[in-house]
Amino acid sequence: LPQAMVGRSWDDAGGLFYTPLKATCPGLFGAEFYHIHRADLHAMLAQDISPSRTTFNATCTGVREDKTRAIATFADGETFEADLIVGADGVRSVVRDALWGPEPAHYTGHMCWRALVDVDEHPLPFASPDAAFWLGPKGHVVTYYVKGGSQLNVVAIAENSDWVEESWSVKSTKQELLDAYPGWHADIIELFRRADPDGIYKWGLFDRDPMKRWSKGHATLLGDAAHPMLPFLSQGAAMAIEDGYVLAEALAAFGKDIGKTLEAYEAERMPRTARVQLEARERGRTYHMSSPEELRKRNEAFKAEQEKNPNAVGIKAEWVYQYDATTCPERF
């Protein structure tokens, strides 16, 4: 539970904004603001999956339709038929390509690194119990605690024109990370130096425009397969979870009427996820401004917004957290 969201300048750690979270989110949104490590979230979700209904190591190669069902095909020759097939197969979705044809992703010119710093073994007196956003020219760094405060998660994004692979699992090194942030504040450099050398990964950030439709016949998309988004609003996993909840409610409401189910699902989810996609794209431009004049205007805008509404969550992002997926049946 972070105390606040804090914006800092890349070179002198000067404050850009301070948004209280722990003290304000329950009153504003009826819930706490949590940080969770992705692996822990996966483990929690996996607890509710029945092993007898799960097949692993099955590579989907496509989806086709008959009159009343969708049929998924797999690399081993097996097929799977269902009233509804949901492609939740990520940014390189085979199901999306089968439904709508291949769509090449656009490389944004940004590289992202992720790393973990073990706080138990290496105390970090300079790291506050906040979510910290260090904003600099052509890059930014985000830090926040995970694993009950025993580790600090570090996400660093910088401009880089030389990336071509859309992958989350490419290993990197401390030196490569340090080289991407010359002249940054000593606290950031120290974090990079303390990172677990076996846990530093990098990936290129690829973008796609919002889709006009997700569903066709008896198949649809969910999560990154439907709306891959840049990480500048930290909403990728949240949007996928919301998708899943709304789709389940639509199925409960309309039963085997797959047409009405998918119509309700898209009507509820597509406007919201498209807005998040586009706002995340614009947020990246704001974070990575480089000219002195741009930085001055941006920082003045941060301060003005802070004075106007000290309890604002994030930077004009209240609308992200005000949404309540559990009320979706009222809108079907």
Model-assigned labels for residue ranges:
Residues 38, 65, 82-84, 88-93, ...:
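Glycine-/small-residue-rich beta->alpha transition segments that form the dinucleotide
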Residues 86-87, 91, 113, 143, ...:
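Conserved mid-domain beta->alpha element of the FAD-binding
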Residues 56-70:
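A conserved short coil-to-beta-strand element within the FAD-binding core of flavoproteins
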Residues 1-8, 106, 126, 194:
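A short alpha-helix-loop-beta-strand transition element characteristic
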Residues 87-101, 119:
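Flavin (primarily FAD) binding-site architecture
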Residues 51, 97-112:
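Glycine-rich beta-alpha-beta "Rossmann" dinucleotide-binding loop(s) and their flanking helix/strand
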Residues 14-42, 69, 75-80, 116-202:
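Conserved FAD/dinucleotide-binding core of flavoprotein oxidoreductases
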Residues 1-48, 286-287, 294, 301:
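Active-site-adjacent segment of FAD-dependent monooxygenases/related oxidoreductases
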